[in-house]
Amino acid sequence: MIAQVSTKAHRARFLNACRGKWVLGATLPLDLALFSKSQPWRFYAGPTLALELSGSTAWAAGHANPEELASFLAFCGCESIILDENECPPPAGWCKAETLTVFGLAPGKALPLPAADETLWAGLTHGREPSAMDVARALYPADTAKQEDFYSELCTKRTRGKALVWALRQRSETICTVGAYTLANRQAYMACGQTAQPLRGKGIGGQFCGGHRPRGGVCPYVPCQSVRHGQYDIEGRGTA
């Protein structure tokens, strides 16, 4: 039976389902520790399942009965779920929307850095502790609600040493950013690597993102090994 994480037994089930997993083994336990009493997060556990809900999207570690999972997600008003296809059967009746591939770089390894436009690169300013709101606006320029949610989550993690973010600025504008948005369980989950549209294809994103990673721990971000996560939705808006 899937139940809200409200007891020590539920918490133990949740953490056991996450143990040893790439990305989900870091992000879900940290989110539970930081946001278990905050909206819009909700956390549930089954005998072999950890489930995090935020808005209409769910993240699952472990596995559950497909019929039970589909019924539970419908009850919670979820429209999509991200899960490890090698471990968790999709909810009954749901269709795959896309495949998300997670890459990992082992400790001590480095990325080959692509060539960047030297003139452009020389005119950029490197920000090691950029404003959380500046980063939020760069990532979600047209969505103030997402900006506010991103800002709140990043500030909460940053103040506890659980996230690092870097940015490149061209004059006063943030034009490239990447971050380790979860630092937990010897993993550094790198995400939200993005370059402003007019400057893409000039090598600055690859040069910048490839040159940043926290020290120590596996970095589930770049090639060495890979894990495929599937995103499924109830309406089957696409296939992959």
Please provide the spans of the model-predicted regions.
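Short hydrophobic clusters on alpha-helical segments that form packing/core surfaces
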Residues: 190, 212-216, 223, 228
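…primarily DNA-binding HTH/wHTH and HhH modules…
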Residues: 228-240
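Acyl-donor-binding surface of acyltransferase catalytic domains
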Residues: 50-120, 226-231
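Conserved beta-hairpin
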Residues: 33-54, 162-178
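A conserved beta-strand-loop-helix scaffold within acyl/acetyltransferase catalytic domains
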Residues: 149-194
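Short amphipathic alpha-helix that is part of the acyltransferase structural core
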Residues: 1-26, 110-149
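Conserved acetyl-CoA-binding loop-helix of GNAT-fold acetyltransferases
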Residues: 65-72, 195, 201-215
